Amino acid sequence: MVYLIHFQTKLHHAQHYIGFVASDLMQRIELHRANRGAKLLAALNNNGINWQVVRVWLNGDRTLECRLKNYKKSRCFCPLCTGKA
């Protein structure tokens, strides 16, 4: 599945993270919270910036993850940024 994380405050230019997990999303989120996932999320944690999972594509695969990342406008998929929350 593919997931979208929204940052409470921008870190440099970034305000979102798109990731993929094959099985257990909650376990992956716990790894991110423990600074053992993506380096970007570890930097957020170290700077005290809160973040949350705002969207999940349950049938998403790595191909979808790459397409979403290549789109370069992840805010378009974020319900908090588009006002659809």
Regions found by a protein language model. Give the residues of each.
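Cytochrome P450 catalytic domain signature, combining two hallmark sequence patches
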Residues: 36-42
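GIY-YIG nuclease catalytic motif and its immediate N-terminal context
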Residues: 1-30, 34, 47-85
